[in-house]
């Protein structure tokens, strides 16, 4: 079979794992796998990055037997919609990773359930009652599912998600760093802080911990990724 894969290089660790899986599958099944990887900057909207995303247009959809679509790596709304339309119009089989999309097969985790388990652990094992949350890009599927899980479990347990400590980043290091600097300033100003912070991914959580290291906030706020 001849398979096309579409991805944006926004998350090195996630993509490396996916590439290793593709490599192993190719060795086992001897399929021809073509990777279309764009490196456009998320949310930029400028002409340079729009041209980067136009790279996906080079794929001749009729030349392939099927597609692999790690949709959560493609977060530019118009780019994502255009690519989806081309995949669906081709009438070729396609597997979506991490996001359930009508008409496509799906492989992924239950994003909401995983976040509910994090809340349950923090509350049950560590006695946390107030939470902050740093999420991914607000309009994306996985961010919505993760927030749904956090909010529903907190409500169920009668706990508090502090609205002033719910922020949206882009899963990159700087998002966690920015959130941490905001919290350091609030702590120094004597403002109320959550007892724990839930991060939507490990990189933002690591950035948070690294940023508060050596400050008065170090060791005072547990964070999960």
Residue ranges, per PLM feature:
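Bacterial carbohydrate/catabolite-sensing allosteric modules
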Residues: 1-44, 50-225
């Amino acid at each position: 079979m001849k398979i096309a894969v579409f991805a944006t290089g926004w998350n090195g660790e996630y993509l490396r794992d996916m590439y290793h899986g593709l490599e192993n599958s190719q060795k086992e099944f001897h399929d021809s796998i073509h990777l279309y990887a764009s490196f456009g900057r998320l949310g930029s909207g400028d002409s340079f990055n729009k041209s980067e995303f136009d790279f996906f247009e080079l794929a001749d959809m009729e030349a392939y037997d099927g597609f692999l679509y790690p949709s959560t790596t493609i977060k530019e709304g118009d780019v994502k919609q255009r690519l989806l339309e081309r995949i669906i119009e081709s009438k070729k089989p396609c597997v979506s990773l991490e996001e359930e999309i009508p008409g496509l097969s799906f492989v992924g985790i239950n994003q909401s359930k995983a976040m509910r388990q994090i809340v349950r652990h923090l509350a049950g094992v560590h006695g946390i009652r107030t939470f902050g949350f740093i999420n991914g890009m607000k309009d994306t599927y996985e961010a919505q599912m993760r927030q749904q899980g956090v909010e529903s479990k907190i409500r169920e347990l009668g706990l508090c998600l502090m609205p002033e400590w719910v922020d949206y980043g882009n899963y990159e290091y700087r998002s966690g760093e920015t959130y941490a600097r905001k919290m350091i300033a609030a702590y120094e100003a004597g403002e109320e802080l959550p007892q724990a912070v839930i991060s939507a991914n490990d990189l933002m959580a690591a950035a948070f911990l690294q940023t508060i290291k050596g400050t008065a906030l170090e060791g005072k706020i547990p964070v999960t990724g």
